[in-house]
From Swiss-Prot:
Protein name as catalogued: Cholesterol side-chain cleavage enzyme, mitochondrial
Known pathway: Lipid metabolism; C21-steroid hormone metabolism; Steroid metabolism; cholesterol metabolism
Catalytic activity: 6 reduced [adrenodoxin] + cholesterol + 3 O2 + 6 H(+) = 4-methylpentanal + pregnenolone + 6 oxidized [adrenodoxin] + 4 H2O; 2 reduced [adrenodoxin] + cholesterol + O2 + 2 H(+) = (22R)-hydroxycholesterol + 2 oxidized [adrenodoxin] + H2O; (22R)-hydroxycholesterol + 2 reduced [adrenodoxin] + O2 + 2 H(+) = (20R,22R)-20,22-dihydroxycholesterol + 2 oxidized [adrenodoxin] + H2O; (20R,22R)-20,22-dihydroxycholesterol + 2 reduced [adrenodoxin] + O2 + 2 H(+) = 4-methylpentanal + pregnenolone + 2 oxidized [adrenodoxin] + 2 H2O
Gene Ontology CC: mitochondrial inner membrane
Protein EC: 1.14.15.6
Record gene name: CYP11A1
Annotated family: Belongs to the cytochrome P450 family.
Alphabetized Pfam families for the sequence: p450
Function: A cytochrome P450 monooxygenase that catalyzes the side-chain hydroxylation and cleavage of cholesterol to pregnenolone, the precursor of most steroid hormones. Catalyzes three sequential oxidation reactions of cholesterol, namely the hydroxylation at C22 followed with the hydroxylation at C20 to yield 20R,22R-hydroxycholesterol that is further cleaved between C20 and C22 to yield the C21-steroid pregnenolone and 4-methylpentanal. Mechanistically, uses molecular oxygen inserting one oxygen atom into a substrate and reducing the second into a water molecule.
Amino acid sequence: RGLPSRSVFLRGCQASLSTAQERLGHPGVPTREGVRVATRSPRPYHEIPSPGDNGWLNLYHLAEEKGTHRVHYRHVQNFQKYGPIYRENLGNVESVYIMDPEDVALLFNSEGPQPERFLIPPWVAYHEYYRRPVGVLLKKAQGWKRDRVALNQEVMAPDAIKNFVPLLEAVSQAFVRMLHGRVQQGVFSGDISDDLFRFAFESMTNIMFGERLGMLEETVDPEAHEFIDAVYQMFHTSVPMLSLPPSLFRLFRTRTWRDHVAAWDVIFTNADKYTQSFYWDLRQKQDLGGSYRGILYSLLGTSKLSFEDIKANVTEMLAGSVDTTSMTLQWHLYEMGAALGMQEMLRAEVLAARRQAQGDMTAMLQSVPLLKASIKETLRLHPISVTLQRYLVNDLVLQDYMIPAKTLVQVANYGMGREPSFFANPEKFDPPRWLDKDKNATHFR
């Protein structure tokens, strides 16, 4: 996470450490190794630059500019206007926005073992009103930690990920065959956005349940396609309720709220069907030949989570994997299509790794650094989440401002990725930048 925690030096009116780069014109006394000790106390919270404290007026201007779906551009404009930190009220949500990697390191180093995250209001409202079970996405404190530890071992650990490789390879091969078939038939249009959604869902269900749903066949299960459409609708209808209380949308039974509820209902209904169906299939199968049986089977075997908690987490992972995976792939293909020289380099690397690995996909994945760098570069230019959010556990000084505990701080991913002081030629798709061994670039490893 970059720099070690320095927040212990930044409490109250104590002296603070900063880099040799002077910030906001505050004087400093030089010490050894380029570090300075600030000679002033941190400035108060209300002095953080802001476009205005009237959250509803700010929200009105945002809507007037049709900026709800372009809020990442607003972040960039505000950073250009106010500097590397600013605060803003939008509706009933007040946040401090940061983009400096050193500030981000301080933020995450101060969060403790149970981070307090910003929970998406419409998602919380739906789950609470309809009493739906929640998983790691919406849990807090000890409940979040218990689920996260269990999922780390079965979903995030390197040994667990190795089990996914043959399952993902099978889906990938089927996806390529499907596209080749269309090319040979002369019906390939070039628009594969819907196919990428199907590929993402087929991949996730295969590693979740150890079986395919047939999303890449000519005839697709209507319920499975309905699930994908519901995920899109759930995300789309969330945006208007991020700054206005979802209870207002529910009170007036707006179409936004009704569509949001309908989307979540489909997600829960179908995810529950899949989980129950594969659960009983697994119980009836006595011998699977020692092959990996999927995340669901592994979670059931650990006894660390109740069946209800498992179902809630399976639902969230299925819903969260479709849009995020497919959009990243779509942007990655777009960037490679616009940089044909880089595309040829990536193809050459993959072919060489394939020959060297002699069919061992796990070994092959260890020999494609440029491919991995290209995915990092795609996420720099097109991050899945516009911001990452944390509520401060304790007071914290950022950019020489004292920010009180419980304040919502948002890391502007898009703004940081496009900032020329952090990335040379930030608009350029340049994967080799991630292969640089520059020791000063520790924040982005």
